[in-house]
Amino acid sequence: MVDENDGKGLESRPPTISDLVTLCSALNAEGAIYVVIGGMAMIQAGFVRATVDIDLLIEMSKENQERVRRALMSLPDQAVREMHPDDIERYTVVRIADEFVIDLMGRACGMDFAQAMDGIEQVSIDGVLIPFANPGLMWKPKQTGRDKDDLDRMFLRERLNKK
């Protein structure tokens, strides 16, 4: 147990594929509507790279936000308790820093879940069906000025040109 006054807090670690499977299993059990985007989707598409979080684009109904919240309560630190009910509507990204970090988004580069639906590929990992953004869907969110997005764009361009 961490003493609240010792200046040392809990630290998150980079997520593993096993973490993703555990998270998605909990989300699926709650009936949450979401898609995995970002680094984990890039890894699933075949680009070997590290990621510091799991990015989720979620459907924004109040009911779905509650399903996501309940699923995140299954994580060890239950860090989602610090999230306010309207945070996903108020902020571009809501970072849940539990044992590993989950970034929740209602929109990614102007795109909401309804607009993303056609670009979702369901992939089974360890018996858990996980909705990943396909390379075509990942293209738009990667149009940023970040260095790591430059590398992702080069990979996606190659993947999309091969199709």
Regions from the PLM with identified roles:
Residues 1-163:
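Compositionally biased terminal segments of proteins
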